[in-house]
């Protein structure tokens, strides 16, 4: 499991009011399944991030053995660390020497930023609820896009691997996880 915070983004309503949001991104590095959790405000606290991680990821998906995160206070703080300890998940902060260890999250953030820009420019926003609505729709679009994108290494979409169904057509998909693991290792060895 890789987690990271993205944002803050300021959404401006028609009346000039500004609303700030950020998000918690969660990616399973085995399947590349993504979930994105909307957070209020620009500087989320560790207890808030931990609570949202527990409610939005741990309540829906199998418990990960390990959680990789950067050195931000939202992950190193007591609240987030308590959630990891409660669920017996090994926390692993990236180091200065290996800052790219959480690169899987960082690459997805650029996709999300592009989606958010389009939604913010093409939607009328009147108030906080409208701003939140834009953010939720942009996040849903980004989640869907990442789940239906064919991964070069896996030769399947993350949605196909996790749900064993095509994400667009109503047909079953059987992915050979052993072959995927071997293909990944081969690519690593070649580089």
List each model region and its residues.
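Extended, hydrophobic alpha-helical segments in both membrane/secreted and soluble proteins
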Residues: 34, 48-53, 68, 77-80, ...
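Short, surface-exposed connector motifs at secondary-structure boundaries
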Residues: 31-35, 59-66
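Flexible loop/turn segments at secondary-structure boundaries
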Residues: 9-10, 33, 44-46, 74-77, ...
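An active-site-proximal beta-strand-loop segment
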Residues: 1-35, 40-41
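Active-site beta-loop-alpha junctions of metal-dependent nucleic acid enzymes
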Residues: 19, 36-60
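Acidic/histidine-rich, metal-coordinating catalytic segments
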Residues: 62-76, 91, 95, 102
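Structured core elements
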Residues: 2, 25-26, 36-38, 68, ...
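Domain-scale segment recognizer with a strong primary affinity
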Residues: 80-191
């Amino acid at each position: 499991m890789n987690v990271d915070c993205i944002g803050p983004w300021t959404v401006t309503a028609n009346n000039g009011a500004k609303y700030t949001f950020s998000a918690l991104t969660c990616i399973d590095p085995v399947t590349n399944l993504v979930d994105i959790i909307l957070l209020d405000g620009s500087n989320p606290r560790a207890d808030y991030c931990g609570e949202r991680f527990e409610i939005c990821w741990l309540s829906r998906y199998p418990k990960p053995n390990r959680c990789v995160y950067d050195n931000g206070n939202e992950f190193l703080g007591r609240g987030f660390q308590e959630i990891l300890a409660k669920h017996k998940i090994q926390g692993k902060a990236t180091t200065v020497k290996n800052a790219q260890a959480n690169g899987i999250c960082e690459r997805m953030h650029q996709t999300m930023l592009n989606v958010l820009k389009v939604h913010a420019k093409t939607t009328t926003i009147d108030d906080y609820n409208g701003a939140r609505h834009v953010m939720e729709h942009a996040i849903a679009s980004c989640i869907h896009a990442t789940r239906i994108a064919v991964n070069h290494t896996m030769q399947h979409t993350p949605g196909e691997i996790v749900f064993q169904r095509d994400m667009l057509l109503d047909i079953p998909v059987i992915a050979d996880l052993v072959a995927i693991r071997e293909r990944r290792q081969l690519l690593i060895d070649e580089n």
